[in-house]
Curated annotation (Swiss-Prot):
Domain of life: Bacteria
Protein purpose: Part of the ABC transporter complex CysAWTP involved in sulfate/thiosulfate import. Responsible for energy coupling to the transport system.
Record keywords: ATP-binding, Cell inner membrane, Cell membrane, Membrane, Nucleotide-binding, Sulfate transport, Translocase, Transport
Biological classification of the source: Bacteria, Pseudomonadati, Pseudomonadota, Betaproteobacteria, Nitrosomonadales
Chief site of localization: membrane
NCBIfam families: 3a0106s01
GO function term, MF aspect, one: ATP binding
PROSITE patterns (alphabetical): ABC_TRANSPORTER_1, ABC_TRANSPORTER_2, CYSA
Pfam families recorded: ABC_tran, CysA_C_terminal, TOBE_3
InterPro entries xref list: AAA+_ATPase, ABC_SmlMolc_Importer, ABC_transporter-like_ATP-bd, ABC_transporter-like_CS, CysA_C, Mo/tungstate-bd_C_term_dom, P-loop_NTPase, Sulph_transpt1
SMART domains: AAA
Protein name: Sulfate/thiosulfate import ATP-binding protein CysA
Protein family per UniProt: Belongs to the ABC transporter superfamily. Sulfate/tungstate importer (TC 3.A.1.6) family.
Length: 362
């Protein structure tokens, strides 16, 4: 199933929830709608489902205009954050519910329903819980049952609204891997909403980054992480260091550090913002004859095989603390301690003169 969104807009009073959205979801794709609260991601999902009506624009399923179709005619499965399981029904009956309430002509017979439900419970690896009730299950188990119930009616499209948002971190991580594998096995066109950057990067085939009712960027996890389209995407996708500087005729200056910026060869003394991820910062005790920024260590935090350094710059090139991530081996080699002076330089940075177009400097 292909989903196409054309020129979609939606207002709630004076608030613009969606502003001229254009998007195509490919058959069998697992697409993430990622953004902060109020970005429009859930509204877009609900419009696709038929739970909300757009003020303008079109929703097409397999090139057929479905904008005005009722939700029951769109053949979508919907999974909510809070499960929405029927408390008075067993797990088996919860999964069977959508099949039992179908119109008589479309309703499978009892043996077919039993076979389908058993098959789905085996798929989500919870067939041994068929006779239990929702309150007897963990949060992760309940969410898997909610997904099985959505799949029972054999939807053409699966829509998930922050499906793991109510679960703890360990369970979320386990279910992310499980959902990715399940999708690879089933190849059903799926769209899920999340505000969790790691979740989107780990699970999705492509990510749609949204902000204030607009799409900021569409791309694979690698594309949006390695080549952010603008400062918003850069700051939203994981930890990042922000430096203030200037760019002039193909060169950029951040404090005393000069780097080549050939894509801005025609720039004339523009203010600029440079972004560097913590793992792209080299740390050394000496200058080694190369330009670098001086800083001192404020805090040291070891996280597994990685050591995270909080640094304070000697100049005003960064308005906040600077963070660098190095391996434990490198940390031991440098014999670093709190208060030590170090010299830092970026392996890679992305420069945005006047918050304009993206350029990568290596």
């Amino acid at each position: 199933m292909t989903i196409e969104i054309h020129d979609l807009s939606k207002q709630f009073g004076s608030f613009t929830a969606l502003n001229d959205i254009n998007l195509k979801v490919n058959p069998g794709e697992l697409l993430a709608l990622l953004g902060p609260s109020g970005s429009g991601k859930t509204t877009l999902l609900r419009v696709i489902a038929g739970l909300e009506t757009a003020d303008s624009g079109q929703v097409l399923f397999n090139e057929e205009d479905s904008t005005d179709k009722h939700i029951r005619d769109r053949h979508v499965g919907f999974v909510f954050q809070h499960y929405a399981l029927f408390r008075n029904m067993t797990i088996f009956e919860n999964v069977a519910f959508g099949l039992r309430v179908r119109p008589r002509k479309q309703r499978p017979n009892a043996p077919e329903i039993n076979h389908r439900v058993t098959e789905l419970l085996q798929l989500v690896q919870l067939d041994w819980l068929a006779d239990r009730y929702p309150h007897q299950l963990s949060g992760g188990q309940r969410q898997r049952i909610a997904l099985a119930r959505a799949l029972a009616v054999e939807p053409s499209v699966l829509l998930l609204d922050e499906p793991f948002g109510a679960l703890d971190a360990k369970v979320r991580k386990e279910l992310r891997a499980w959902l990715r594998k399940l999708h690879d096995d089933m190849h059903i066109t799926s769209v899920f909403v999340t505000h969790d950057q790691e979740e989107a990067l780990e699970v999705a085939d492509r990510i749609v980054v949204m902000n204030r009712g607009r799409i900021e960027q569409i791309g694979t996890p690698d594309e949006v992480y390695e080549k952010p389209a603008n400062p918003f995407v850069y700051e939203f996708l994981g930890h990042v260091n922000l430096f203030h500087g200037r760019v002039h005729q193909g060169h950029a200056w951040i404090g005393d550090l000069e780097v080549d910026a050939p894509e801005y060869s025609e720039a004339e003394d523009l203010s600029a913002i440079a972004y560097v991820r913590p793992h792209d910062i080299e740390v050394d005790r000496t200058l080694n004859g190369e330009p670098a920024l001086a800083a001192h260590i404020v805090h040291i935090l070891a996280i597994g095989p990685v050591v995270r350094l909080e640094l304070a710059g000697k100049d005003n090139q960064s308005t906040n603390s600077i963070y660098a991530e190095i391996s434990k081996e490198r940390f031991r080699e440098l014999q670093l301690a709190r208060g030590d002076q170090v010299f830092i330089k970026p392996r890679k940075l992305d420069l945005f003169p006047n918050h304009a177009q993206n350029g990568s400097i290596h």
